[in-house]
Design a protein with these regions (language model features):
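The cytosolic transmitter module of two-component sensor histidine kinases
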Residues: 8-12, 30, 79
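Short helix/strand-capping hinge loops at secondary-structure junctions
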Residues: 22-27, 55-56, 105-106
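…primarily DNA-binding HTH/wHTH and HhH modules…
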Residues: 96-110
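Residues within helix-turn-helix
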Residues: 31, 42, 78-81, 91-92, ...
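Short, Lys/Arg-enriched, Trp-marked, Pro/Gly-tolerant hinge/linker segments that flank
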Residues: 1-17, 35-37, 50-58, 62
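Terminal helix-turn-helix DNA-binding modules in bacterial transcription factors
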Residues: 17, 21, 50-92
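Core residues of bacterial helix-turn-helix
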Residues: 36-37, 86-87, 98
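Short hydrophobic/aromatic patch on the recognition helix
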Residues: 43-44, 48, 93-94, 98
Length: 110
């Protein structure tokens, strides 16, 4: 029972929409997204990667980093507040992930 191309495309688009609207939830997992879409996590990861060249987890991280960079540029919020507002539970881990993504610390980026 193979899913149609249209069905796989819709799953990928819905996955992107969920990530783009729920990225700020620290407990958002790819398993949660797969459950919301009524598909297996492994299947979701495979088809998402086919369509976007990145895993859902990588896309979630990218969305979080881009939103964090916007907040760093446009607000005076503390790095800690920004970390929490883009879905990180640990501001130190956020700073490390941000530096890996942008090759700059959040404070240097600002």
């Amino acid at each position: 029972n193979k899913r149609s191309v249209g069905s796989r495309t819709k799953i990928c688009l819905d996955c992107r929409r969920i990530i783009e609207t729920q990225y700020n939830k620290a407990d958002l997992s790819i398993q949660d997204i797969a459950s919301q879409l009524n598909v297996n996590r492994t299947y979701l990861t495979r088809i998402f990667k086919e369509y976007t060249s990145m895993s859902p987890k990588q896309y979630l991280q990218e969305i979080r980093m881009k939103r964090a960079s916007q907040l760093l540029e446009n607000t005076k919020e503390s790095i800690k507040v920004i970390a929490y507002s883009v879905g990180f539970k640990d501001p130190l881990y956020f700073s490390k992930a941000f530096k890996e993504f942008y090759d700059k610390s959040p404070s240097d980026y600002r």
